[in-house]
């Protein structure tokens, strides 16, 4: 009458998302979320405003801020979800990757600053939009009431004559 069935794979989360009990785990989780194109894990790297007094803030490059002024004037966690979901949808099954090369300059009991270079690849197939973005980033991270670390402030710094992450956010959020 009853039979054992095959286990279904999880629809969200991943074995590569580790509870971020230290700032460095947030960075590793972000790299994995991009590589796996996992929207939920990507958002989990950003501050959970239900468990923290901190609010998320994204500071785009000056060029992207000018080009997508109306988009970035009201940027939010929902904007992060929208752009990432759209970018993921355009890329289909093509591989993606994120490499962060940096270090923490300051770590206190409940906050940290990470600075480094990024190289992100999404094979989205849209003409006129680079599939590689390069630049530097500064993340301000905080620990919430549950002792979980996340990014509260994200500053994108452009590389000369290269497409920035901000350009992708502005383009794919619309």
Give the positions of each predicted feature.
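Short beta-strand edge/turn micro-motifs at domain boundaries
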Residues: 1-15, 111-174
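Short, low-complexity N-terminal intrinsically disordered segments enriched in polar/charged residues
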Residues: 1-36, 44
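A solvent-exposed, charged loop/short amphipathic helix patch at secondary-structure junctions
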Residues: 5-13, 58-68
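N-terminal targeting or signal-anchor segments and their processing/structural boundaries
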Residues: 20, 82-85, 89-109, 150-174
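Stable alpha-helical elements in mature extracytoplasmic
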Residues: 26, 38, 42, 76, ...
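Short, well-ordered alpha-helical segments enriched in acidic and aromatic residues
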Residues: 37-62
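Surface-exposed, charged secondary-structure patches
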Residues: 65-130
């Amino acid at each position: 009458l009853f039979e054992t069935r095959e286990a279904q794979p999880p629809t969200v989360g991943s074995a590569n998302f580790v509870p971020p009990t230290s700032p460095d785990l947030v960075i590793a989780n972000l790299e994995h979320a991009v590589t796996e194109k996992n929207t939920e894990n990507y958002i989990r790297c950003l501050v959970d405003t239900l468990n923290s007094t901190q609010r998320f803030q994204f500071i785009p490059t000056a060029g992207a801020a000018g080009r997508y002024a109306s988009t970035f004037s009201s940027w939010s966690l929902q904007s992060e979800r929208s752009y990432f979901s759209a970018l993921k949808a355009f890329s289909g099954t093509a591989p993606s990757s994120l490499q962060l090369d940096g270090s923490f300059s300051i770590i206190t009991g409940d906050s940290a600053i990470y600075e480094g270079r990024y190289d992100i690849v999404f094979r989205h197939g849209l003409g006129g939009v680079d599939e590689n973005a390069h630049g530097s980033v500064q993340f301000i991270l905080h620990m919430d009431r549950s002792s979980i670390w996340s990014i509260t402030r994200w500053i994108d710094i452009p590389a000369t004559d290269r497409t920035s992450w901000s350009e992708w956010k502005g383009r794919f959020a619309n």
